[in-house]
Amino acid sequence: MVSRVFYGLLLALGIAAPAHAHHSFSAEFEADKTADLSGKIVQVWWNNPHIRYRLQVVGEGGTTEDWELQAASITAMQQLGWTQATIKVGDELTVSGQVGRNGAKKLYVRSIARPDGSRLMTGRGDATGPDPNQVHATPGKSYAYGATRNDYPVDISGPWRNRYKWRVTVDDLEPKPTPLSAEGRALFAATDHYQDPALRCLALGLPRLFGAPYNMEIVDAGTHYLIVYVEHNTPRRVWMDGRKPPPDTPPSSLGFSVGHWEGNALVIETTNLLPGWLDGSGLPMKGEGTRIVERYELAADHLSMDRIMTIYDPYYTQPLVRRRGSARDDSGVDIGEQAPCDPDSYYRDLLELGKLEQHLKGE
């Protein structure tokens, strides 16, 4: 690779957000503008909420510029076969991707070319291996751990792959346009991208956790289902014995969930939620008075399910709906512990934007 670098912004009409784009992709990057950069990797940050690299670019006059390259989370990239050694300090690369908003020297990586001609891809559609939107499972096979504890119509326990029918959790709620109330609209307008709790590695919680592409495991614990999400190693209990939340139950990011079966559908209702964001764009959730209803509708062969979430929140004049899917998988579903989230990149961004002092003062 030549050390002299040419980079140019290209209008790329019709390019969608990357399949593994992190929570705030739309707020940080221009989905319809791309750049091609060539240079040398001078720094690697292998941590969550997203992997980052620093690329040193040499211009026509010999001057250098540093660009920050961003990819998805460690878990998402590992699902595509990446490791910490995939890109190392000293590697010379040509990188293509979406550029940062407002002139920021950032690039969300779509593809990488090495000097030997080999390429690395970061998007689902570019990855090798089975199509994640197809079910790769065997009819009649048991995916549960041991005997079923309860006489439910369906045994939903075991591991599930959540990249099935997945989409980025930004601007994915229906209906459109978003039916914000006057209070909700004012709050949304005053929201800054850098207030995103996910960037600070805070618990994602509901309803955003529902939309994540990472795998989950469901365990029948008798009185309740225990749902373990790979995302931030998060456990969630869904009570199936009809209990109500105790009067002194504090609100939390996952709230208090109760469930029941309606035929082949597990129905979960959640209350007692903390205020938060509904998606990566910053749509607000009030928490107090918020009610979330989920339906996990199993297919006839029980190898996949459609998950539908309906959100009732005082900041909106109509219920909001989010749709995802889950599938069994014969090749195995990784439910191992996720690498811990590191907020270092969040504070670095605040420092570069001159907002760190403002943040520390709570302004």
Regions found by a protein language model. Give the residues of each.
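Positively charged n-region of N-terminal signal peptides that target proteins for export
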Residues: M1-R4
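Bacterial N-terminal signal peptides
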Residues: F6-A17
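Signal peptide processing junction and immediate N-terminal pro/mature segment
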Residues: A19-A21
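PEST-like low-complexity, intrinsically disordered acidic/proline/serine-rich tracts
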Residues: H23-E363
